[in-house]
Amino acid sequence: WPAYPGPNGIRSSVCQTKLGCGKKNLATKGVCKAFCLGRKRFWQKCGKNGSSGKGSKICNAVLAHAVEKAGKGLIKVTDMAVAAIIKYAGKK
């Protein structure tokens, strides 16, 4: 189970800063914001040890790792997608 980022670490604004949302291109901002909000909800629900008492289905180590990894991959993928869209749009 990855380390709980802490009450400050799960904040959407902190997450966005860490991921550098919208720095390279503004299109990543929306995707990034949505991801950071989802991540915040995940950690709020799952807490430090990964369960909200009821053993929620979404609170598992695999998902927690995926959530933390996704942030890093997400921006890269969005940047690539935006670049591809711009390239494609320019061809018409």
From Swiss-Prot:
Disulfide bonds join C15-C36, C21-C32, C46-C59. The keyword Disulfide bond applies. GO terms for biological process: killing of cells of another organism. GO terms for cellular component: extracellular region. Keywords: Cytolysis, Disulfide bond, Hemolysis, Secreted, Toxin. Localized within the skin and proboscis and are most readily isolated from body mucus secretions. GO terms for molecular function: toxin activity. It is found in: Secreted. Belongs to the worm cytolysin family. Cytolysin that shows hemolytic activity (on bovine erythrocytes, HC(50)=5.75 mg/ml). This hemolytic activity is completely inhibited by small unilamelar vesicles composed of PC/PG, PC/PI and PC/PS in 1:1 molar ratios (with at least 100 mg/ml concentration). This is Parbolysin P7. It comes from Parborlasia corrugatus.
